Every structure is written in structure tokens, then in C-alpha cells.
């Protein structure tokens, strides 16, 4: 049976290092463990998970899934690209699917350069600071859009 809702969960640079990189900031779970937890928490959703260290690969993936059709939205942790990637911002603007920006840490409690997001204005919302739950809240936000 085909799932009624398909979502892309997309992660940017350095998120492949979760579980090893600054666990006091990002937690001790690996990205694979986070992805498995998302899939278990939302069995009614068909997920595609994607991570790249490269800006262009994230942009290509957004365009690819829109071209394929059938996706209801994107949960995006763009990592450091959040703060400077105009190209990613433009790609988010170019797709018709809703995108939720998520961050494991509360970026506003961290270094000043992390306080500015160039992608927030083209996302439907931003969730930050709840650890792994940030991803779950992002999924819930996208699923709830059908009830509005």
C-alpha cells in the first residue's frame, strides 16, 4: 500500500558527523539513528532521507524530487549553509513544496554569525533548539498543513 504522504528529510554539510561532532551541542545520536527515529515515529509517512556536504547536491535534490512529484514537503537542516547560501535560498523559492527549516541547537544561543538565516524567509517556518525533536516538530508542521 502506497503511503499518502511522502516527505524529504534533507541535511547539509557536517551533519554526517553527528554523534561525533560536539555532542554537547548536537547530541550523541548519529544521523542514521535520527533518521530511523523519524521513520519509526511517523509510520504513516513515506520518507526519503538525503545528506550531502555539497551545496549543489542539496539544490539538485530539491529539483529532482519536485520533478518526480508526489512529495508533500521538505524538512531541511541546511547546517552552515543556512547562514550564507543564496543559491539554496533561491532553490527553495523555486520549488512549490513547503520547506520547514530545522536546527538541532538553538542557533540564537550560539555565535553571532549563526543568528542570521538567509533561507528562513522562503521557508514556511523555523524550528530550532529542540535537539532531535526539531525534526519531529518539522514533520508534524508539514503534516498539519493539510488540516488548515
From Swiss-Prot:
- EC code(s) of this entry: 4.2.1.10
- Reaction equations catalysed: 3-dehydroquinate = 3-dehydroshikimate + H2O
Q: Which UniProt keywords apply?
A: Amino-acid biosynthesis, Aromatic amino acid biosynthesis, Lyase
Q: Which EC class is the enzyme in?
A: lyase
The function of this protein is: Catalyzes a trans-dehydration via an enolate intermediate.
Write down what this protein is called.
Answer: 3-dehydroquinate dehydratase
Q: Where is this site: Transition state stabilizer?
A: 21
Pfam families of this UniProt entry?
A: DHquinase_II (PF01220)
Q: What PROSITE patterns does UniProt report for this protein, alphabetically?
A: DEHYDROQUINASE_II
Which Gene3D superfamilies does UniProt cross-reference here?
Dehydroquinase, class II
Annotated GO biological processes are: amino acid biosynthetic process; aromatic amino acid family biosynthetic process; chorismate biosynthetic process; quinate catabolic process
In the record, the note on similarity to other proteins reads: Belongs to the type-II 3-dehydroquinase family.
